[in-house]
Amino acid sequence: MKNIYNMYDFFESLTDIEDPRQFKKVKYPINEVIGMTLIASLGNANEWTEIEVFCKLHETLLKKYFKLENGIPSHDTFQRVMGMVNPNIIQQIQATWNEYISQNDGEGIKTMAKA
């Protein structure tokens, strides 16, 4: 992953992930699905339905980081897309995310909380 200097860089770096889906069938960009899942996890959303609900409740915040041209994905879409991504890639993303959050004294979280 690229060097991460802020939350925008982090979420932008997710666009480099290979999307295993058929291009013509993609409604939600992979960086948005993964990014929203990570943000929702900070809000204690652990189930796919909780992730969907969290994202719908915080759509204004999420629009700071993502285009959301097609709105918020359903819980089924979150589950399906995340299930298609290589688990090693997900583990690497999670490690980078955790490192960013811890190295910056939670500044990313504070920034999101102000939204």
Segments the model singles out, each with a brief description of its role:
Residues 1-114:
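Dynamic "connector" segments at or just before major functional cores
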